Structures are given as structure tokens and as C-alpha cells.
């Protein structure tokens, strides 16, 4: 029997998350907010404030400052932070965490907080590399008498001829490069490049002038490099300070039995010492002074910040005042509440007053019924769902009376019911009503619990 199997495509499935539709802050060139743009609806004042923050971050004038997004649940705080990250682009580090993430049995909470601080600070290292690139026209090792005596001969240097589109060059190379060339199995007619600083040699492929040759091995034919043989290339690398910390905190061990056994055992999370971080900061500052690297302060976004305790807030105060610190964006949906880690100290948003005094607070306000309707229409389009106008009005009504999250969560089950009921036009009002009966919202569930309290365990 002939075996036939389907080949799965390599393209990823399109998944939609809660904030997939957010593409940016949706601001005009003068910094004012569009009513609806880049997937963002409403919250004009908050978006304009975030736009100013983005401009300050890009100008590198915002480092070491903290911003707070304060508002009720479902008012777009996380969406604002995500829009800020979209506006900044991929080159600026953006590290989102939740307040409860920093509690661990292995690492103390202040260490976890500092780790995320360092993740949000980038270092852009610019390195100029001198490269010799071309097609090999000559490869002659020159021998000399062995300095150790005897009849053997050693390679004193290597003569190599390289040809590019603009000319040829003959190079005299160190014998150590000859070993690298032998490893790469370079022969006359191959295209190679050699780094002048490190002596690293890489075989790119066979010159396409030899493409007509018949060979048993499948060769990759490449064109002769353009420009001169000797080139200067600027290479830009983006790393975070946390990457540097980890590289130095966990150096690769030797080849003895004990280090091999240590690598096989369950890796324990390494706690990076303050001394090591100070040493790395010294090296980073030296690079910045030399002009080799530049610091890119990123954004640390802490959602549900009221979950941090009093020790974390005290540490946050000190960390914000350090010379190398990112922009910190906090978000909380609490009003007056007890600060975690204390018995009876209440404060606005669950944050101590001394830290609150250092924050620039951006308020978010509940959405209007029209804005809720626009958001639901936008989400339905993002998820590829068709919805009729009466059904949209009903869902929007739930969004304003119950909650926006509940209204958005009704869309996908309603689309499945519409498909089962054979409605080609999309989601109708009856599907929303059926979903409403199947899935309770928080208020109705709480009402049932209070009515039938004796049937539940207390």
C-alpha cells in the first residue's frame, strides 16, 4: 500500500488575544487623539498624555521617572501600556510583568524586581569590523624551517589572493588562519570572508563562475562580492543589562566531571549579586564614555501594582533614583485599600504616599455606550465575525450595563451558536440572548449565591 501523508504548513495560525486590535495610540501629527484610530477608541486625554511620554522616552529624557495608569476595571489601562510599546517599536526594551509575578520560593522579591528593571534597560553596541571578502584566486602556504629543530617544516604564513567586482588583493595571513581555512575546506574558486580583528574565516559558497562544472556534491553558488575586497562594516547589537548579568553570573564551566554533573542536575535559579551588577555597570559606563555603546532606557510595565508589598515599594523608591533605571509604568484598578504587607495602613491605589508623590498619574475613565459599541464592532472584525446591527446593539447594552469584558466574551460563543443554528448572515439577537442564558455575568452569579447561600459552602 502506498503511504500518503499530509504535510502541515509552516505558517502560524492567526491567534487573537485580548489586545490584538491595538496597533498604537492613534494620535495625529500634532499630538491630539483621533476619536478612533490604530484600534484605540476613546480615552483621548490618557492617549495624549501617553503620547507625550513616548516622545520623552524617544528623546531619552524620561529615564528614572514613574507613571501611573489609574482607573476602574475595563477602562483600557493595559491597552494603553501596550500601545506605548507599539509606538516605541522593537528597538526599545519593553518588559511587562504582573505584581504577583515577583514572589518566588527560590529568589527574594527585591532580586526579582531588580532583574526586571535590568531587563528593561537596553545597550546598543556599535562595532566596526574590517572584512576581506572575495573569490579565492590563489591559496599558497609558505613553509619555513621548524624552530624546534628536526626535519619537519612549519607554515610561516599563507598567501591568499581575493577577487571582487572592483579589483583583486593579495594578502599575507597568519598561520593560525590557515587552520580555519582548512576546517572550512576552502579551495580556489570559493567565495570567503575574513574578519581582520579576530581572524575568523567563513566560506560563503562557490563562485557562480564555476556553476557549469559537474560535481557530485550539491554546491551553493554565490555571486562574486560587489565593491572592494577590503570593506568596513558597522555591526549594531542590541542587548539588555540582564543579558550581561546572566552571561557573567553563569559562566560556562570546565570539562571536568564535577562541572559536567553540575550541568546535568536541575538548574537552580541564580541570584545575581549586587557586586557583580556594579562591576557590569562600570564596564557599561566605560563603553559609553568610549562611544562604543549607548544606553537605551526602556519601559518596565507593572500591572496590578497593588499586589506588591511594602518592602517592594521601598525598594522601588531606591531603584528609581539609581543612575541606570528605566521608565516605570504602573497600573492599578484599586481605590482606597490596605497596602499589602501592613495590617491597617490604607492608601490610594494601595501604594504608599511617599511613592505616590513621585508618580505622574494618568487617569482612565469608563467608556461611553457609543465607544463600547465601536470597540465591540472592532473586536468582531478582528476575530473575523459577522454581527447584525440589532445583535451589536444588544451586546453594547451588556457592555455598558454589565461590563465590557463580559460583552466581548459573548461574541465567540454567539458565533458558534449562529453557525449551529444555520444563520449565514452572522450573529443575530437570538444568539446573544441564548448565550446570555448559558453564561452568567458576575452580578447575576453573585445574586444567585446570595439567594441560595445555604446551598453553598461558606
Swiss-Prot record:
Binding site for ATP: 71-78
EC number annotated for this UniProt entry: 3.6.4.12
SUPFAM superfamilies given in the database record: P-loop containing nucleoside triphosphate hydrolases
Cross-referenced Gene3D superfamilies: 1.10.8.60, P-loop containing nucleotide triphosphate hydrolases, RuvB-like helicase, domain II
Major site of localization recorded for this protein: nucleus
Catalytic activity: ATP + H2O = ADP + phosphate + H(+)
Pfam family, one: TIP49
GO CC annotation terms, alphabetical: Ino80 complex; NuA4 histone acetyltransferase complex; R2TP complex; Swr1 complex
An example Gene Ontology molecular-function term: ATP binding
Disordered as annotated region, ranges: 1-31
GO process annotations (BP): box C/D snoRNP assembly; chromatin remodeling; DNA repair; regulation of transcription by RNA polymerase II
Cellular compartment(s): Nucleus
Keyword tags: Activator, ATP-binding, Chromatin regulator, DNA damage, DNA repair, Helicase, Hydrolase, Nucleotide-binding, Nucleus, Transcription, Transcription regulation
Quaternary structure and interacting proteins, as annotated: May form heterododecamers with RVB2. Component of the SWR1 chromatin remodeling complex, the INO80 chromatin remodeling complex, and of the R2TP complex.
Function: DNA helicase which participates in several chromatin remodeling complexes, including the SWR1 and the INO80 complexes. The SWR1 complex mediates the ATP-dependent exchange of histone H2A for the H2A variant HZT1 leading to transcriptional regulation of selected genes by chromatin remodeling. The INO80 complex remodels chromatin by shifting nucleosomes and is involved in DNA repair. Also involved in pre-rRNA processing.
PANTHER family found in the cross-reference section: RUVB-RELATED REPTIN AND PONTIN (PTHR11093)
UniProt record similarity statement: Belongs to the RuvB family.
Protein's UniProt name: RuvB-like helicase 1
Species per Swiss-Prot/TrEMBL record: Aspergillus fumigatus (strain ATCC MYA-4609 / CBS 101355 / FGSC A1100 / Af293)
Amino acid at each position: 500500500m502506498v503511504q500518503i501523508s499530509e504535510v502541515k504548513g509552516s505558517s502560524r495560525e492567526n491567534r487573537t488575544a485580548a489586545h490584538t486590535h491595538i496597533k498604537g495610540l492613534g494620535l495625529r501629527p500634532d499630538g491630539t487623539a483621533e476619536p478612533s484610530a490604530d484600534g484605540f477608541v476613546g480615552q483621548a486625554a490618557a492617549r495624549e498624555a501617553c503620547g507625550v511620554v513616548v516622545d520623552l522616552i524617544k528623546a531619552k529624557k524620561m529615564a528614572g521617572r514613574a507613571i501611573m495608569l489609574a482607573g476602574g476595571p475595563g477602562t483600557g489601562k493595559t491597552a494603553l501600556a501596550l500601545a506605548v510599546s507599539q509606538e516605541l517599536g522593537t528597538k526599545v526594551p519593553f518588559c511587562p510583568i504582573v505584581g504577583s509575578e515577583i514572589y518566588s520560593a527560590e529568589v527574594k522579591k527585591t532580586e526579582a524586581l531588580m532583574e526586571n528593571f535590568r531587563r528593561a534597560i537596553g545597550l546598543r553596541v556599535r562595532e566596526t569590523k574590517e572584512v576581506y571578502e572575495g573569490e579565492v584566486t590563489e591559496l599558497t602556504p609558505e613553509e619555513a624551517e621548524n624552530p624546534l629543530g628536526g626535519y619537519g617544516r612549519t607554515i610561516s604564513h599563507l598567501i591568499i589572493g581575493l577577487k571582487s567586482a572592483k579589483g583583486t588583493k593579495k594578502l599575507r595571513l597568519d598561520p593560525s588562519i590557515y587552520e580555519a581555512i582548512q576546517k572550512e575546506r576552502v579551495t580556489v574558486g570559493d567565495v570567503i570572508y575574513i574578519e581582520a580583528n579576530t581572524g575568523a574565516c567563513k566560506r560563503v559558497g562557490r563562485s557562480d563562475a564555476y556553476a557549469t562544472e559537474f560535481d557530485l556534491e550539491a554546491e551553493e553558488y554565490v555571486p562574486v562580492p560587489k565593491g572592494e575586497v577590503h570593506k568596513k562594516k558597522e555591526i549594531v547589537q542590541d542587548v539588555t543589562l540582564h543579558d550581561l548579568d546572566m552571561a557573567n553570573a553563569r559562566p560556562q564551566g570546565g570539562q571536568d566531571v564535577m562541572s559536567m554533573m553540575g550541568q546535568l542536575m536541575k538548574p537552580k535559579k541564580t541570584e545575581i549579586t549586587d557586586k557583580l551588577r556594579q562591576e557590569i555597570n562600570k564596564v557599561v559606563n566605560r563603553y559609553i564614555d568610549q562611544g562604543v555603546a549607548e544606553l537605551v532606557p526602556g519601559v518596565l510595565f507593572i500591572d496590578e501594582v497593588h499586589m506588591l508589598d511594602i518592602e517592594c515599594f521601598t525598594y522601588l523608591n531606591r531603584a528609581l533614583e539609581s543612575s541606570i533605571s528605566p521608565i516605570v509604568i504602573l497600573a492599578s484598578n484599586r481605590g482606597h485599600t490596605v497596602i499589602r504587607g501592613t495590617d491597617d495602613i490604607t492608601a490610594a491605589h494601595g501604594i504608599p504616599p511617599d511613592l505616590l508623590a513621585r508618580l505622574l498619574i494618568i487617569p482612565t475613565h469608563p467608556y461611553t455606550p457609543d465607544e463600547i459599541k465601536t470597540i465591540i464592532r472592532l473586536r468582531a472584525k478582528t476575530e473575523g465575525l459577522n454581527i447584525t446591527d440589532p445583535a451589536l446593539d444588544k451586546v453594547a447594552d451588556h457592555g455598558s450595563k454589565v461590563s465590557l469584558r463580559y460583552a466581548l466574551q459573548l461574541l465567540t460563543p454567539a458565533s458558534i451558536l449562529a453557525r449551529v443554528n444555520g444563520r449565514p448572515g452572522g450573529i443575530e439577537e437570538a444568539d446573544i440572548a441564548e448565550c446570555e442564558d448559558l453564561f452568567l455575568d458576575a452580578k447575576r452569579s453573585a445574586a444567585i449565591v446570595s439567594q441560595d447561600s445555604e446551598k453553598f459552602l461558606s
